[in-house]
């Protein structure tokens, strides 16, 4: 049975609040579907939990939204506040509750990921954590993307590492192995254990343990030299020189350079804060990490503490420095220090420097945080101006948060595809992009129909919503209820505006499709014609009067161009696949199954063409006679 929110069940709420113990511990807030919304900790559970429901208590919009959904609260009592902190950290890490995401770093700054769960792990740059891959290890988030890419490129030149997600060939190594960039993991030319040992050395660079790595490599170089393995010794020497080059431009030195320190400072404006972490190891700046935070209902000390809890709960204990310099005194300075010391198994000091060089570095980190804050605010303000202007152009009731744009791509009807791109708050949200293969039997080579294609795509896109409405659902009421109901019904993708790449004809076909779905009164739909950049709205013959350089039009063009790029990329990919298959279809005796086997094994027509008879005949499921036919087709002059 689904529980109703506590805030609407005064009797149950009153009974629950009376029985809360005033001990240290954690509280887990859940919605009516038993989904975890929020995990919190407190020295006194009763006082903290009651504060959420106390009348007259001003909560931030984010927390107010959460409280309206809370239907059950689970309590876990601990012996002390330190245990509560550790438990909270573990619960957040395990469950990733929606309302615990105070820090907004996922899409702004990249991480370095090492896939330790693989037999031969990869190392790559990413902006998104893979939730299901628990053995993945992440380093970051790094502020300087250019420097991170450069560092990763240099590391892959210094150490032979796996270069590809999918092997280029199934039965042989590629060029990367020949030039020493890869140890031949696809053919298991190196054992998994030896490869992981190499990667552990690379990991030490991102952990800031370059001094340890240098000592390790120097010992190995001497060992190789004494064993007269001069080529191996030279390779290790080159790695040592390369590591030195990675940091040779780093001149920032702080007192007691033998000590490892992280310096953390922040800058705030309105409801957003930028937090920067400078990682100093052996007197050198080896990393600059960044977070953004919603600071409504939080002061500077709370935000800094939240950053520290979040960041250090996700790193290896060896990466925790012996000293952390912070801009403001933390809410629970001693508690956090003891917690980190317990994880590291070594004393960790958290200090607020007031004078000397350390205080100057805090100011420098604060300055960098402020620069990053202004950069983000400037981008946000620009997007807001564009969205506001677009709202005025189209006479919309509200600023469109989610905008979708659709485009069709084909060549005279062949390989017809469509794209759906999504902008949220004026920014491309690539995780929501979709591609469609046009399925209508009327669309074929020599016969194109953009109107029918667009109608098909829109019908497929909004079919779920039409079914919901047909079953008696109220779309407007559903959208106004910002609860977990949308996610539960898999109806969390309603756009505030739909943009069609095309003119009046394409717009009319889309409106007709929406009328058939009975959604024409719910959706805002427009079209943008390429030739004169004209904007059309339903049931109006003339285009809207606009200026080409006004902010709203710039946003529409950027959206349309992105939809076109995404559609044409998919079209080229599909056409390339068809052309590969069509060439192989000309070879006598090759059916669809064998064509599929060939392409899976060799990856390209060029590779099949270059393959020897031995390579062809050893392809699983092919056989010698078929290999002869393929070889003769591509090399008729060598036919004996």
From Swiss-Prot:
SUPFAM superfamilies: C-terminal UvrC-binding domain of UvrB, GIY-YIG endonuclease, RuvA domain 2-like. It is found in: Cytoplasm. Keywords: Cytoplasm, DNA damage, DNA excision, DNA repair, Excision nuclease, SOS response. One of its GO terms (molecular function) is DNA binding. Residues 22-101 form the GIY-YIG domain. It holds the Pfam family UvrC_RNaseH_dom. One of its GO terms (biological process) is SOS response. InterPro entries: DisA/LigA_HHH, GIY-YIG_endonuc, GIY-YIG_endonuc_sf, GIY-YIG_UvrC_Cho, Hlx-hairpin-Hlx_DNA-bd_motif, RuvA_2-like, UVR_dom, UVR_dom_sf. Residues 211-246 form the UVR domain. The keyword Cytoplasm applies. NCBIfam families: PRK00558.1-5, uvrC. The UvrABC repair system catalyzes the recognition and processing of DNA lesions. UvrC both incises the 5' and 3' sides of the lesion. The N-terminal half is responsible for the 3' incision and the C-terminal half is responsible for the 5' incision. Interacts with UvrB in an incision complex. Belongs to the UvrC family. This is UvrABC system protein C. It comes from Prochlorococcus marinus (strain NATL1A). The gene is uvrC.
């Amino acid at each position: 049975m689904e529980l109703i929110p506590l805030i609407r069940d005064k009797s149950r709420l009153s009974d629950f609040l009376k029985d809360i113990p005033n001990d240290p511990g954690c509280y887990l807030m859940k919605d009516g579907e038993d989904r975890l919304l929020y995990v919190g900790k407190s020295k006194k559970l009763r006082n903290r939990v009651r504060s959420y429901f106390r009348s007259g208590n001003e909560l931030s919009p984010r927390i107010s939204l959460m409280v309206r959904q809370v239907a059950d609260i689970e309590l876990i009592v601990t012996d002390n506040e330190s245990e509560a902190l550790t438990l909270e950290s573990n619960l957040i890490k395990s469950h990733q509750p929606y309302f615990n995401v105070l820090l907004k770093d996922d899409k702004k700054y990249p991480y370095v990921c090492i896939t330790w769960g693989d037999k031969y792990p990869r190392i790559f740059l990413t902006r998104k954590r893979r939730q299901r891959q628990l053995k993945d290890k992440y380093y970051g988030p790094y502020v300087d993307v250019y420097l991170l890419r450069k560092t990763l490129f240099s590391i892959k030149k210094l150490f032979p590492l796996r270069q590809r997600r999918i092997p280029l060939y199934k039965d042989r190594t590629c060029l990367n192995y020949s030039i020493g960039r890869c140890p031949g993991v696809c053919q298991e030319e190196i054992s998994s254990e030896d490869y992981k040992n190499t990667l552990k050395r690379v990991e030490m660079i991102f952990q800031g343990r370059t001094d340890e790595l240098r000592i390790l490599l120097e010992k190995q170089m001497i060992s190789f030299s004494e064993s007269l393995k001069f080529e191996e010794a030279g390779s290790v020497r080159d790695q040592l020189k390369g590591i030195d080059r990675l940091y040779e431009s780093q001149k920032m030195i702080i007192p007691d350079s033998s000590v490892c320190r992280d310096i953390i400072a922040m800058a705030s404006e309105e409801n957003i804060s930028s937090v920067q972490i400078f990682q100093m190891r052996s007197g050198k700046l080896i990393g600059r990490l960044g977070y953004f935070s919603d600071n409504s209902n939080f002061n500077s000390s709370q935000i800094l503490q939240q950053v520290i809890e979040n960041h250090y709960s996700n790193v290896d204990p060896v990466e925790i420095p012996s000293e952390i310099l912070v801009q403001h005194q933390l809410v629970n300075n001693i508690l956090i220090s003891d917690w980190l010391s317990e994880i590291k198994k070594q004393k960790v000091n958290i200090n607020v420097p007031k004078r000397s060089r350390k205080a100057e570095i805090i100011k420098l980190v604060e300055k960098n945080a402020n620069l990053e804050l202004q950069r983000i605010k400037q981008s946000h303000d620009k997007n807001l101006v564009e969205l506001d202007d677009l709202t005025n152009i189209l006479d919309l009731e509200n600023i469109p948060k989610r905008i979708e744009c659709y485009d069709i791509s084909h060549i005279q009807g062949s390989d017809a595809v469509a794209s759906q791109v999504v902008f949220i708050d004026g920014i491309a949200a690539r995780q929501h992009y979709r591609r469609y293969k046009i399925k209508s039997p009327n669309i074929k080579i020599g016969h194109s129909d953009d109107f029918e294609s667009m109608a098909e795509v829109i019908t497929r896109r909004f079919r779920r919503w039409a079914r919901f409405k047909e079953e008696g659902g109220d779309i407007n009421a559903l959208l106004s209820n910002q609860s977990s109901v949308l996610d539960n019904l898999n109806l969390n993708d309603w756009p505030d505006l739909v943009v069609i790449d095309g003119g009046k004809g394409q717009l009319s076909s889309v409106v007709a499709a929406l009328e058939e779905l009975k959604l024409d009164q719910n959706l805002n739909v427009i079209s943008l014609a390429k030739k004169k950049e004209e904007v059309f709205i339903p049931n109006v013959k003339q285009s809207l009067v606009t200026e080409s350089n006004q902010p709203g039009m710039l946003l529409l063009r950027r959206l349309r161009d992105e939809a076109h790029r995404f559609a044409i990329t998919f079209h080229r990919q599909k056409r390339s696949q068809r052309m590969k298959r069509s060439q192989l279809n000309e070879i006598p005796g090759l059916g669809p199954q064998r064509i599929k086997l060939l392409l899976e094994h060799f990856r390209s027509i060029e590779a099949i063409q270059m393959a020897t008879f031995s390579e062809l005949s050893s392809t699983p499921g092919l056989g010698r006679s078929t290999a002869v036919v393929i070889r003769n087709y591509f090399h008729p002059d060598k036919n004996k």
